[in-house]
A protein has these predicted regions:
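Acyl-donor (CoA/ACP) binding surface of acyl/acetyltransferases
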Residues: 1-17, 21, 26, 51-88, ...
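Active-site rim helix/loop that mediates acceptor-substrate recognition in acyltransferases
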Residues: 32-51
Length: 170
């Protein structure tokens, strides 16, 4: 089992790295789904240190395997976001679990909220595997503009993972 090392993206150069990888893998639009053609500035807005914490996950060879970012929501709850890069996707269960453990160890969080487009079935599967509760439907919650439909909104799902229900030791 791979053990990932998490580094806080606390400089502009570190915060830029995930977007460069997203672009090279052709997944920037899937990750930054509220923009028709996401650019670096859109990504930097997502991980702006004024309202987000961002960590980079590196594998044993120090290659960037993924990124996780957290927006504090209310009190001790944060909205969590993941991006797992191609080389690490076969290990998504392990990487996601380690990312969640890292978040709970790095911040005094009572729970994590995840919100995603309902048609992203792989995210629904991942949320279930990582221990998030049953997803609830949020009608038209995800602004996903298209070139010809700039106001398009799609249904979203949301789920919660409470610290007390997550085994940090596993």
């Amino acid at each position: 089992m791979v053990t990932y090392r998490f580094v806080e993206a606390d400089t502009p150069a570190l915060r830029r790295l995930p977007f460069e990888r997203m672009e090279s893998e052709g997944i920037a639009r899937a990750v930054i789904w509220n923009r028709v053609d996401p650019c670096l500035l859109d990504w930097l807005e997502c991980v702006n240190p004024q309202y987000a914490f961002c960590w980079l996950a590196h594998d044993r060879n120090n290659a960037l395997a993924g990124t996780v970012w957290l927006n504090p929501v209310m009190g001790l709850c944060g909205c969590v976001h993941f991006c797992i890069f191609k080389a690490a996707r076969p290990d998504w269960k392990n990487l996601g679990r380690q990312a969640i453990a890292h978040l709970f160890q790095a911040r005094p969080l009572a729970g994590l909220l995840a919100v995603w487009p309902a048609h992203y079935r792989y995210v629904t599967r991942a949320a279930k595997h990582w221990g998030f509760g049953k997803p609830a439907l949020l009608p038209k919650a995800c602004h996903m503009p298209g070139i010809h439909k700039p106001a398009r909104c799609r249904d979203g799902l949301m789920a919660v993972l409470q610290r007390k229900n997550f085994n940090l030791e596993a």
